[in-house]
């Protein structure tokens, strides 16, 4: 289980508000460790006995986004993961992450690029107790950079039926963030977010597993982006998620189809849909190939100011919240990717993953996108290696 880390740090410059590709929506620490949710399940089925061997892994991420004629943000990140059993009933895990972010980000809408550079260092740890029919995991995290400090704690429990075909899960996480932007727009701002998750995983057949998760988040404090012109967001934010997953094993090819859907809605007026499709195909000599597709769509926040109504270089003439940030506009996005993995000998596993992301107002589903948004593209390359010990 990954402990929650900040997802609203403006220096990360995520593409979308929620449900966008993992490499853009979350902070880089989470991206490298595949933490797509604040309280993710460790898998569709949670092991109920401590692993017999430990695991060590390295990850490297190179991410670059761009708009027409202008490269924007580049992220290069490294992570070290370690997990080891400490008895037949206990295991501990930890992750150290370091990343460098550089490039330019729009000050408003998708124009007026401003240069930026930042480095981040993060550490996460968790302790798991295994019971005959369940687990309990406690976690903590710390993420630090020049203008942002985040501290988090979390707890997650699972409980399985006697047949092991049904697993219930519940988790809670708390994050406390301190924000001190280098431009001095605000000083000593705070943000606190609590996230809860309940889930059910069910084995339907020897080849089918389904899962449903319900999530809720509630936060208060500073959610604005101090590096953007005309950005004054509400100081409270609540959101709910519904996540559905289905894994199906193909008997004829020995491959597995993985399908997922996620719905998100918050009190800012944003409603988002995410559809994930992936197919894992084992090949000869230890090779595995996984093509993937992700479709995303969101509505605009109630306080989003479209480009046509922008009063730049003056703030919008309104007494309420406002933002010209395209991340809270209405748009659609498409991600295409492929992952190739190679088992080397009995222990070493190498993997290489490539994803290409595109964002357009015209791609929004269930309604029109926000007008005058520039096309946005991003690509990420992730290299990993791991082995048990």
Pin down the residues of each PLM region:
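Solvent-exposed loop/turn segments connecting transmembrane beta-strands
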Residues: 67-75, 117-119, 142-152, 236, ...
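Repeated loop/turn-to-beta-strand initiation elements of outer-membrane beta-barrel proteins
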Residues: 90-92, 133-138, 163-168, 207-212, ...
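Flexible, solvent-exposed coil segments and beta strand-coil junctions
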Residues: 55-63, 104-106, 131-137, 175-182, ...
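Residues on the lipid-exposed face of transmembrane beta-strands in outer-membrane beta-barrel proteins
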Residues: 80-84, 125-129, 155-159, 198-202, ...
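Short glycine/proline- and aromatic-enriched beta-strand/turn motifs that initiate or cap beta-hairpins
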Residues: 46-86, 90, 182, 357, ...
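Outer membrane beta-barrel transmembrane domains
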Residues: 111-113, 215-247, 263-274, 286-381
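Cleavable N-terminal export/targeting peptides
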Residues: 1-52
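Transmembrane beta-strands of outer-membrane beta-barrel pores
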Residues: 60-66, 98-102, 131-133, 142-146, ...
């Amino acid at each position: 289980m990954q402990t929650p880390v900040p997802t609203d740090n403006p220096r990360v410059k995520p593409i979308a508000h929620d449900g966008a590709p993992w490499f853009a929506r979350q902070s880089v620490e989470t991206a490298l460790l595949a933490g797509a949710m604040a309280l993710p399940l460790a898998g569709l089925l949670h092991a109920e006995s401590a692993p017999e061997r430990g695991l060590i892994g390295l990850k490297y991420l190179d991410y670059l986004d761009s708009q027409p004629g202008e490269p924007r943000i580049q992220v290069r990140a490294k992570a070290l993961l370690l997990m080891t059993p400490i008895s037949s009933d206990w295991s501990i895990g930890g992750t150290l992450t370091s990343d460098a972010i550089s490039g330019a980000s729009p000050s408003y809408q998708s124009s007026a690029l401003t240069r930026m550079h930042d480095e981040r260092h993060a550490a996460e740890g968790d302790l798991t107790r295994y019971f005959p029919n369940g687990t309990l995991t406690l976690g903590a995290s710390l993420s630090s950079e020049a203008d942002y400090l985040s501290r988090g704690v979390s707890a997650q429990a699972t409980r399985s039926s006697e047949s092991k075909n049904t697993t219930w899960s519940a988790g809670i996480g708390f994050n406390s963030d301190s924000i001190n932007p280098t431009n001095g727009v605000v000083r000593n701002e705070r943000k606190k977010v609590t996230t809860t998750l309940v889930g059910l995983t069910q084995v339907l057949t020897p080849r089918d597993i389904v899962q449903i998760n319900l999530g809720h988040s509630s936060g208060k404090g500073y959610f604005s982006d101090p590096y953007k012109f005309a950005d004054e967001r509400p100081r409270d934010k609540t959101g709910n998620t519904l996540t559905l997953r289905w894994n199906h094993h193909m008997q004829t090819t020995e491959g597995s189809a993985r399908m997922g859907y996620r719905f998100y809605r918050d009190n800012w007026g944003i409603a988002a849909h995410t559809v994930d499709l992936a197919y894992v195909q084992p090949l000869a000599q230890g090779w595995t190939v996984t093509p993937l597709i992700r479709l995303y769509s969101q509505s605009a926040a109630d306080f989003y100011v479209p480009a046509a109504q922008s009063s730049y270089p003056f703030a919008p003439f309104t007494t309420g919240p406002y933002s010209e940030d395209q991340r809270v506009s209405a748009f659609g996005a498409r991600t295409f990717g492929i992952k190739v993995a190679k088992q080397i000998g009995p222990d070493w596993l190498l993997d290489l993953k490539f994803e290409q992301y595109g964002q357009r107002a015209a791609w929004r589903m269930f309604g029109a996108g926000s007008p005058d948004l520039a096309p946005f593209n991003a690509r990420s390359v992730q290299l990993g290696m791991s082995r048990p010990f």
